[in-house]
From Swiss-Prot:
Localisation: Cell outer membrane
Species this chain originates from: Haemophilus influenzae
InterPro entries to which the protein is assigned, alphabetical: Plug_dom, Plug_dom_sf, PT, TonB-dep_rcpt-like, TonB-dep_rcpt_b-brl, TonB_Hb/transfer/lactofer_rcpt, TonB_rcpt_b-brl_sf, TonB_rcpt_CS
Span of domain TBDR plug: 61-188
Highest taxon of source: Bacteria
Chief localization: membrane
Name of the protein in question: Hemoglobin-haptoglobin-binding protein A
Motif (TonB box): 51-58
Positions of short motif TonB C-terminal box: 1029-1046
Length: 1046
């Protein structure tokens, strides 16, 4: 019934439009382009002016301009009206484009026309944003374990003036990466607000129940003489996105079967500052500072290597703490010239310096302090001023561990009186049964000729006494009840030297009390040493072995909790110069709008991994290492150094800096030319061409660049120098040879690589009638292989990856045709498209390669990135909008809209493309008061089920499955959103919205396909489906905001 009603709405839109076309009295003028810095209505209010600056590209219900083929432009008013808080909300009511889900790290770019992430270009003010490490081998090795924040960053919605979404191959504006499409963000400018006055101020507060997000945005703009400036400062603070049924799930469950969303505290801080100097109408200088920082701190309770804590308390269990960040900084300088010359009407030169760092930090430690294992001191042990062991009551402790025996005199009657020897006359078996386990020797105390009628025998029963007395209580350490009071780890044998902090001992003395097994106490000598400004007592080794000699007692062995941590940073730093020119020409009866220019950029991409272990909650009894050096000097004059067994002690605060990627500097040069020209009022063409040249220069400097682990590359290509790796701990000389071998192999890998590509787009627009438009487009785009796809190397017997310096650039060609019916009432556009991808980069199994290991050749299962032949995506779309107020005055302000996308795709002819979204329809009903005092928007979104035959599990063979489809998919669903706003006074706007009005339980396909078949993160129980509720979208939720404008 729901589908029938929704389809009826779509038919009503088209029927109304057709009727409007038939009875239209006036033709529709063709739209004209307007510069974004020129106002279209000097009499509008400030909030309207921001929208009116971008009339051509606006996406407002009141704008019935037919859309350009495969392009959507959303100005600032649209996301503001929809109360969008992130890029997912930005495309919430769009079809054919979705946001890629990345688990705890949030979103990672867009999915368009069967491809996603790096194959959909993302730009902010013309600058490419950070790409993911797209090597499939890297993703399979590391991404499934939650160790890398391998995501694409995004923009703060409140800073955006305009968003341009292009579908299909089009590298003219975006260069490398726009295979499936592109998303371009343009930030706000002071000129957008300062039309009729010299100042503007706005303050907005908002709240979202889905993730408990609080929003604050302050916007200030002003002009003084030749200067103008704008500042947009935004702060967002919230928590994890609450999945459907969030409050009903058990919060104590950990692991893959956890149904409740993992807890995170998320913040997002953004500052956009622009300062401009415009001494004349034709010259303008600007400085831009764009700062963006996103943080997420919490716990990976769904991490599969953690135990289930349903019946335990969190503070006593080691937990995985996460601290993820995205930090983007951009400093830009711009010069604009508006003087009309034979070569340009506008000229813009800009220089940008952008640095983006994505960080993933994990810390594994216990939160409970003294409640944690081996951390407490339940007996209150301490050493007094005489360094004697006492309890909480201050009385001396006592210890005894002795072996004694009990003698029982037995008189055994003769059972065999006729035997010659006395001991043979006794039944010894009966005595053994009486004293099981006690050695019995057949021997009588009496002589053989003794006249007595019995045999005397002393039974010696061994007896062990092991007691510990403290706080006035004696513990029998041999009993079940007390045996764990003092563990072996608390008894420190004195055949070794120990290093204790003087915080717990009186270092004015020179001994510490020890206990002999027989119960007597002895003084263990120590000397005081100083390290890093702190004093320690170094005890003397007084025993010959571990079993003999006295013991020193401590509350526990370690005296601290261990924090195992890793921090992995992916950094992209870009320096870019752009030259952009526009020119309008009239040649005969044709009009040409030219845009041309070029860019040069230099981008450095690198990875830095730091991992280690550090102590937490350090107690006075902690045993410090004598030395943290890797090697210890030889004990003999000419001997070789030896590895220090204490070098990995947690109290050394160990850390190791390394990388899995070779740093690469990418240099890009590009030239482009675009001509939009109109022959007459019925025929228009556009043509564009772009040439890109990309060069990769690996920059690996031994000793300076974060080290590539030797075992990843040794003996890969170069076999010299040879070394003996059969030894567990290599001596220094062999270690140097191994490092030299690794350096030689890295040098063989890091060879420069160049790519060049030509991109183009050809299109036409035909308007044979004033209500009919035909559009056609043919475009080509490319994506150069990322540096990690070329150079990434990994060596392991089960999964090795070899670099591939022969990779070719991926290409895409799109053909698209659109038919539009339009007039002042609205429009209906139907388009069909066909995109062909070539040279898709994918991971392929290359067989067994023999690698020199442990002085012999060992077969390694080897993979390599290769170019796949082709992939194809086809589909069709509908976009419709009608203003009912144009039909009858009674319905003035009421608008209907409809969008629909269907697409299907395959790789190599038969492998489904998982990035393709199911069939999606969005129906909209909108009302806006003629004076803009209030308005309502109602959206119906229907998404079909993801069919099994349209999914592909690339690991089905490894999982032992015959079916290559993905088991857990999204079902069909329909959601309803109701949004509204009211302006009670001129300067105040109140907004509110109800999302998922019917409280429908559903999972999106992008969320379902983020579930991984293996790893430790984003996992569920694949057999039962337990844990999948964690991936469901929120139930009914609300948003509200209040905004003051002056």
């Amino acid at each position: 019934m729901t589908n029938f009603r929704l389809n009826l709405l779509a038919y009503s839109v088209m029927l109304g439009l057709t009727a409007g076309v038939a009875y239209a009295a006036q033709p529709t003028n063709q739209p004209t382009n307007q510069p974004t810095n020129q106002p279209t209505n000097q009499d509008g209010n400030v909030s309207e002016q921001l929208e009116q600056i971008n009339v051509l590209g606006s996406d407002n219900h009141n704008d019935n301009t037919p859309p350009k083929i495969a392009e959507t432009i959303k100005t600032a008013k649209k996301p503001e009206k929809e109360q969008a808080q992130d890029v997912k909300d930005l495309v919430r009511y769009e079809t054919g484009i979705t946001v890629v889900e990345a688990g705890r790290f949030g979103n990672s770019g867009f999915a368009v026309r069967g491809v996603d992430e790096n194959r959909v270009a993302v730009q902010i003010d013309g600058l490419h944003q950070a790409e993911t490490i797209s090597s499939q081998g890297f993703k399979e090795l590391f991404e499934g374990y939650g160790n890398f924040n391998n995501t694409r960053n995004t923009a703060e919605i409140e800073t955006l003036k305009q968003v341009t979404i292009r579908k299909g191959a089009d590298s003219l504006k975006s260069g490398s990466g726009a295979l499936g499409g592109s998303v371009s963000f343009d930030t706000k400018d002071a000129r957008d607000y300062l039309l009729n006055k010299n100042y503007y101020a706005s303050y907005k507060r908002g709240y979202n129940t889905a993730d408990n997000q609080n929003l604050q945005t302050l916007t200030l703009a002003g002009r003084y003489k030749y200067f103008d400036a704008i500042a947009v400062i935004t702060s967002r603070k919230g928590h994890e996105l609450e999945n459907y049924g969030y409050k009903n799930y058990n919060d104590r469950i950990q692991g893959r079967e956890r149904e409740k969303a993992d807890p995170y505290r998320r913040t997002q801080e953004s500052k956009l500052l622009k300062f401009a100097f415009q001494p004349t109408e034709n010259h303008r200088l600007s400085v831009v500072v764009d700062l963006y920082k996103q943080t997420s701190k919490g716990h990976d309770f769904s991490y599969t290597l953690k135990q289930n804590t349903e019946h335990m308390t969190y503070d006593e269990v080691e937990l995985r703490h996460t601290n993820d960040k995205v930090d983007r900084k951009n400093l830009a300088f711009t010069y604009e010239n508006f003087t009309e010359t034979p070569f340009w009407d506008t000229l813009k030169i800009s220089y940008s310096h952008q640095k983006i760092t994505t960080t993933a930090r994990t810390d594994d430690y216990c939160d409970g302090n003294d409640k944690c294992a081996l951390a407490g001191n339940p007996l209150g042990m301490k050493y007094n001023q005489d360094n004697q062991l006492v309890g909480e009551d201050g009385n001396l402790a006592k210890y005894k561990d002795i072996n004694t025996k009990q003698t029982i005199h037995e008189k055994l009657p003769f059972t065999k009186p006729n035997e010659k020897w006395r001991y043979n006359r006794v039944d010894w078996d009966a005595l053994k049964k009486k004293y099981p386990g006690v050695p019995i020797y057949a021997s009588c105390i009496e002589e053989n000729n003794d006249p007595s009628k019995y045999c005397s025998y002393d039974v010696e029963i061994p007896k062990k006494e092991n007691t510990f007395e403290i706080n006035g209580k004696q513990y029998d350490l041999l009993s079940e009840a007390d045996k764990n009071v003092i563990s072996d780890e608390q008894r420190l044998p004195t055949n070794s030297s120990y290093l204790f902090s003087c915080d717990g001992l009186n270092c004015d003395k020179d001994t510490i009390q020890g206990f002999e097994k027989k119960g007597t106490t002895v003084n263990i000598p120590f000397v005081v040493i100083e390290k890093n400004g702190k004093k320690y007592a170094k005890t003397e080794a007084v025993a010959n072995n571990q079993l003999s000699g006295p013991y020193i007692f401590m509350p526990s062995k370690t005296g601290y909790q261990t924090n195992l941590w890793t921090q992995r940073d992916l950094t992209s730093e870009t320096k870019q110069i752009n030259l952009d020119l526009t020119k309008h020409l009239e040649l005969g009866k044709t009009q040409h709008d030219l845009s041309y220019g070029g860019l040069w950029s230099e981008m450095e991409k690198s990875m830095t991994n730091i991992s280690g272990d550090s102590p937490m909650n350090v107690k006075w009894w902690a045993q410090y290492p004598h030395s943290c050096d890797i090697f210890l000097p030889s004990s003999t004059p000419n001997g070789a150094p030896t590895l220090n067994p204490e070098r990995t002690n947690t109290l050394c605060n160990n850390s190791n800096v390394y990388s899995f990627l070779i740093p690469v500097k990418t240099k890009t040069g590009a030239l482009y030319f675009i001509n939009d020209f109109r022959v007459n009022s019925h025929i228009a063409f556009n043509f564009g061409y772009r040439y890109d040249r990309v060069k990769y220069d690996p920059e690996y400097i031994p000793g300076k660049t974060p080290k590539i682990p030797d075992d990843m590359v040794v003996n890969l290509y170069v076999k010299q120098p040879t070394f003996d790796d059969t030894k567990v701990n290599l001596p220094p000389e062999e270690l140097r040879k191994k490092e030299a071998n690794a350096a030689a192999n890295i040098k063989a890998i890091v060879q420069p690589k160049k790519f060049s590509a030509s991109s183009y787009s050809v299109g036409t627009t035909l308007d044979p009638l004033n209500w009919l438009r035909l559009q056609a487009k043919y475009g080509k785009a490319f994506r150069a292989p990322t540096s990690d796809e070329i150079y990434f190397t990994f060596l392991h017997p089960d999964f090795s990856i070899r670099p591939n310096r022969d990779l070719q650039a991926e290409t895409a060609k799109t053909k698209e045709l659109a038919l539009t019916l339009h007039n002042e009432i609205g429009y209906v556009t139907t388009s069909v498209f066909d995109t062909r991808y070539r040279n898709f980069i994918d991971l392929a199994y290359k067989g067994l390669y023999n690698v020199q290991r442990h002085s012999k050749l060992t077969p390694y299962h080897t993979y390599q990135n290769v170019n796949r032949p082709n992939a194809k995506v086809t589909g069709w779309e509908i976009a419709a909008q009608i203003s009912l107020g144009k039909i009858t005055q009674f319905l003035n302000g009421l608008n209907l809209s409809y969008k629909y996308t269907y697409q299907k795709g395959r790789i190599d002819g038969n492998i489904p493309m998982n990035a393709i979204q199911p069939k999606t329809s969005v129906y909209g009903v909108s009302y806006a008061h003629p004076a803009d005092k209030f308005g309502l928007d109602l959206y119906f979104t229907h998404v079909s089920a993801k069919n099994a035959e349209d999914t592909y599990n690339m690991f089905y063979k490894e999982e032992g499955k015959k079916d290559s489809t993905i088991k857990w998919r999204s079902k069909s669903y329909t959601t309803i959103d109701l949004l509204g706003y009211i302006k009670p006074i001129k300067n105040l706007t109140l907004r509110a919205g109800v999302y998922n009005l019917t409280n429908r339980k559903y999972i999106t396909w992008d969320s379902a396909r983020s579930i991984r078949p293996f790893g430790t993160s984003n996992m569920i129980n694949q057999k039962t489906g337990e844990g999948i509720n964690r991936f469901y979208a929120p139930g009914r939720n609300y948003r509200m905001s209040v905004q003051f404008e002056f």
